């Protein structure tokens, strides 16, 4: 008897702004390739692997006909890639609406832990620039300690699942900057500060502070 099993599939979320809204800091061409190519690819990749996993669970595939480690590792990569990119789009705002400095509880925590926003920005930037290869620079709220923690994820295989309380995230894969900044990743990191959506970051933090 065939089991009636189906995993719900993922969908590509809409961009929260027009495709050219982050110019001149992040070009229209980069957003087009990044969103419609790479992010969409993670969604499609995850859904394809979920369909294969369905066949494994149902018993449609016999042992030796599939590589469970490969399926799960592929799901880890593609699902995290999808979720992290969704967060990345959300924490940027069009030119003129992003950048500057945070306010509210986020500013208070930054000042308490790092002394000033400028010092925090320096440490985050140095962290981003020190990342070997590809991955993400991340600011997350540690619900255990109450700290705003800066860390990096190499590739999409980070030690924590993507649902940790991420407040701010910077994509450092080459597809995020190479068309515009070539091999000058540090220039991209510096430009990114001009489109950071601090209002969105504050809302994310408030969600975790009130739990």
UniProtKB/Swiss-Prot annotation:
GO terms for molecular function: metal ion binding; superoxide dismutase activity. One of its GO terms (cellular component) is cytoplasm. The keyword Metal-binding applies. It comes from the Archaea. It catalyses: 2 superoxide + 2 H(+) = H2O2 + O2. Fe cation binds at residues 34, 85, 171, 175. Binds 1 Fe cation per subunit. Its main location: cytoplasm. InterPro entries: Fe/Mn_Superoxide_Dismutase (IPR050265), Mn/Fe_SOD (IPR001189), Mn/Fe_SOD_BS (IPR019833), Mn/Fe_SOD_C (IPR019832), Mn/Fe_SOD_N (IPR019831), Mn/Fe_SOD_N_sf (IPR036324), SOD_C_sf (IPR036314). Destroys superoxide anion radicals which are normally produced within the cells and which are toxic to biological systems. Homotetramer. This is Superoxide dismutase [Fe]. The gene is sod.
């Amino acid at each position: 008897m065939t089991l009636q099993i189906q995993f719900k599939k993922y969908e590509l979320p809409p961009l929260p702004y027009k495709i050219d809204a982050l110019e001149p800091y992040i070009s229209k061409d980069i957003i087009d390739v990044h969103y419609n190519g790479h992010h969409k690819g993670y969604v499609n990749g995850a859904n394809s692997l979920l369909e294969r996993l369905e066949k494994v669970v149902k018993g449609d595939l016999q042992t030796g006909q599939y590589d469970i480690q490969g399926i799960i590792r592929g799901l880890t990569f593609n699902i995290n890639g999808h979720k992290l990119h969704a967060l990345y789009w959300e924490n940027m705002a069009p030119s003129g609406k992003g950048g500057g400095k945070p306010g509210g509880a986020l500013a208070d925590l930054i000042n308490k832990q790092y002394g000033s926003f400028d010092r925090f920005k320096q440490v985050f930037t140095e962290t981003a620039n020190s990342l070997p290869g590809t991955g993400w620079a991340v600011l997350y709220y540690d619900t255990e300690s109450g700290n705003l923690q800066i860390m990096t994820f190499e590739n999409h295989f980070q030690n924590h699942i993507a649902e940790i309380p991420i407040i701010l995230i910077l994509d450092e894969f080459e597809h995020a900057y190479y068309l515009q900044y070539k091999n000058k990743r540090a220039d991209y990191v510096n430009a990114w500060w001009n489109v950071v959506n601090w209002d969105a970051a504050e809302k994310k933090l408030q969600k975790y502070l009130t739990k």
